[in-house]
Amino acid sequence: MLSSKEISTSRMGKEAVIETTMNEALIRLIRSLSASFSNQEQAFENPPLYGNILVRLRPLPQLDPGSLLLEQAYAIASNEPYRVRVLQPTVCPTRGLLILNYAIRDDQRFWGSVEDPQRRSQLTAADLTLLEGCSYQVRETDEGFRGEVEPGCRCLVTRRGKTSYLVSSFELTDDGMSTIDRGYDPATHEHLWGSIAGPFQFKRTDDHSAEIPHHWVTDLKNTGGTVLGNGEDR
């Protein structure tokens, strides 16, 4: 029979293995997200149903490890993104892999900076506001990663002057990414906007993972991503 000390040591060993595995998954997620994507092929095949959209994410070395600038824009107006965010993959001890979702104050200042390192470097933690209820819960799969906006109908967005809650999911692989976003009425749960023809299918066009600073990898291995959040202890 094992002594209490042996049981405690065994438990600590298992927890260390789980933490190491989660840290490695976090680093893989950050690397996989650090890329540019386009659904050009899908848009050209189905022009009535899908616009040609660019999704571009690049590391922000001046912010906490994992922080990525996201710009989402129509290809015909690539420097006028309709969505600008900072995403930060991290690990929560009780919830596993998460992607925190930040709004940027006066985000128009940074339009197009995904392709402009100098302007990108001016983004600071003071410019960010965490969007409560809009984090993505992520799990690793055989093909890559799958994520969904956390449950609770708390991720509120406004489109055309009407408030809705967001239901969003994605699948990320070596080849690309599929996403689906839909908005629902908070009172009636009626579907208000979003794809009715199925997910957007994006192909990976550029890899930006070489821009990930080495100290991020070191810090994430040491902390497990649990004390991150651009100034917040999460």
Which residues does each predicted region cover?
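Short N-terminal edge-element motif at the start of the domain
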Residues: 18-80
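Calycin-type beta-barrel ligand-binding domains and close structural analogs
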Residues: 2, 6, 23-36, 40-42, ...
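N-terminal amphipathic/basic-hydrophobic helices that include classical n-h-c signal peptides
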Residues: 1-16
